[in-house]
């Protein structure tokens, strides 16, 4: 017999499949960029209260300092609010949030949630070279909730080699949905960033979601919108190479979503404190060099 709780769970999942994801995200994006003065400030205050957002660490601590929701979503933090671990053999976490999953890549399969796996081929848009690069490697998936800091930083010093935009769905990526929507992260819109580092090749993926109005990077600006219907690739070589330092900002979400990191086999050892649903902060240790 189906309980009322399981009924509502199934209803939530079913709604994700039938709702107009892109249309709702476009509407949310339009509202988020409006500058309505006191109305905007009132709504921001209500949002911050609902999600218990700590404004004491923001550079701008007053709600009236933000002209739009978008400004509030990507609010920068005070200097040293997130100290970067300076151990030269360690990589640091790229974002505030919670660990959705982490661990070993079994040949080409990553764990999405208990009982659900997805493949490197699907996640990396069938880029054969990248798929081979990360077989039997390590991965970490970090979920950014609406209450979290929405900027994404570098785990280590790196040189950007390639960026790939992959069109897709806009399912919610919260841990509940990750248990029920197959192939969730590999079917959603995403931006794949490929870096050369002293820890081997590293990928950092910014995954879109429902009402994530835009994803941006510090070197290319806003990647979406507009949304595209085909995979787009940018390469960075020679004078166009982009060098980033450990802890440096590399991108942002308007509103929060998910970051996935991939590491080559036998290059890193994930930090012992990483566990599912564990709250984490940008700058804390993610992994160590093997």
Swiss-Prot record:
Keywords: Cell membrane, Decarboxylase, Lipid biosynthesis, Lipid metabolism, Lyase, Membrane, Phospholipid biosynthesis, Phospholipid metabolism, Pyruvate, Zymogen. It catalyses: a 1,2-diacyl-sn-glycero-3-phospho-L-serine + H(+) = a 1,2-diacyl-sn-glycero-3-phosphoethanolamine + CO2. It is a peripheral membrane protein. Pathway: Phospholipid metabolism; phosphatidylethanolamine biosynthesis; phosphatidylethanolamine from CDP-diacylglycerol: step 2/2. Its EC number is 4.1.1.65. GO terms for biological process: phosphatidylethanolamine biosynthetic process. It is an enzyme of class 4 (lyase). The active site is at 96 (charge relay system), 153 (charge relay system), 257 (charge relay system), 257 (schiff-base intermediate with substrate). It is found in: Cell membrane. Heterodimer of a large membrane-associated beta subunit and a small pyruvoyl-containing alpha subunit. Catalyzes the formation of phosphatidylethanolamine (PtdEtn) from phosphatidylserine (PtdSer). This is Phosphatidylserine decarboxylase proenzyme. The gene is psd.
